[in-house]
Amino acid sequence: MRSRARAHVATLFLSTVVASALLATGGGAAHARTPSPTSSIGLPSSVDGGAWASGHLQGTAIDRRRGHMYFSFTNLLVKTDLAGRPIGSVTGLTGHLGDLDFNSADGRVYGSLEYKAAQAFYVAIFDGSRITRMNMDARTTDVLSTVHLREVVRDYTADMNGDGVFDGDTGNTPDHRYGCSGIDGVAFGPDLHGRGGGRLTVAYGVYSNTARTDNDHQVLLQYDVRDWRKYERPLSEDALHTSGPASPGGKFFAYTGNTTYGVQNLEYDGDSGNWLMAVYKGRKASFPNYGLYVLDGSKPARRGEVKGQPRPEYGRIVSLLPGGLHHEPSGVYGYESGGQYGLVSLDDGRYYVAEAGTVDSGGTTLQTGRAVLHRWTGAVPNPFAVRGTAR
């Protein structure tokens, strides 16, 4: 693992040089982007996250007060200014870093972090103020702490068919309660019980499997992170810790139909009070398989049936917003849009919707990411419209 990490850091160093050169010189036509101007009264129409030898773009977060954007590239975190200039990066992650969100209460960036082979799932907490240079190792610097999520482990490792064998990281099995493949989407927002108060919401990944009926919900866990400092531990991939809350503060279910790896990006919109869930589309013919679902923030969670379970089960059900496209046979509402690679609400009807891509650099394929400013229109099928420089 260590030799692999050293080789990866060396590759990322090359990527840093390439990305900086692209930003400085404009690069080739296939990937050149002019950084959008910023001002004291506005935000740019787009923020370029660079090009990297990494996994693909997973999520984005913005620190508006300091003028920083964060990009998760699966095994790499990149910090830029709002002109897209790299400020720093965090390497050394061999797990899967997913969606991100910025916590305005403590000024840190929270993300989902999976180690499926080790059956370990964490919230990764990055101290952005300490990310000051490129290629900072997550294991040997003080930029990252982690909190273990025991509830996710319980559902991920559940032996649903009772054969005494856990089948591992595969969707082709009856194992994994609710089809849980781990975690991905994360966002800060109100308590879904309707009692107020900011919570960190963590969404399950869910395997695509058209043969089972117990995987048709998005599963959301909520945590009060104000006392999480007592759980936080540095990342040690050679000795993964289990320090974290024994259970979530709430567990909620949204009936959408099965998707491919669950909620990729979760975002709370302070303007509408609704929650957005961007997903990779599912494959079940009995569902519409939309790319975006919206939770109705005006309706507190209610007790109801968690449909399709092996035995009757009841839990806290959250409602989809009755708007957009509607699939009458299933009763599911939703939209067709982007957001699967990054979604940031500015809480005033505007969003940064991320785009992912690749470029070739001397025979090496680099992953790219860009956050593009949109406004919410509510139109169907795509409720987002591109707009220019923000006010």
What kind of region is each of these model predictions?
Residues M1-R33:
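Secretory targeting and sorting signals
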Residues I62-R66, F102-D106, P190-G196, D269-S272, ...:
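Residue-level detector of Asp-centered blade-edge/turn motifs that repeat once per structural unit
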Residues P37-G50, I131-I183, V225-T260, G304-S337, ...:
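Surface-exposed loop and turn segments in beta-propeller and other repeat-based domains
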Residues S54-G59, H96-L97, K116-A118, D159-P190, ...:
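Signature of short aromatic-glycine-proline-rich micro-motifs recurring in repeat-based ectodomains
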Residues S40, G50, D63-L93, P245, ...:
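Beta-propeller domains
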Residues P44-N75, H96-D99, D184, D191:
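Beta-strand-rich domains and repeat architectures in extracellular enzymes and scaffolds
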Residues A83-F121:
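Blade-loop segments of beta-propeller domains
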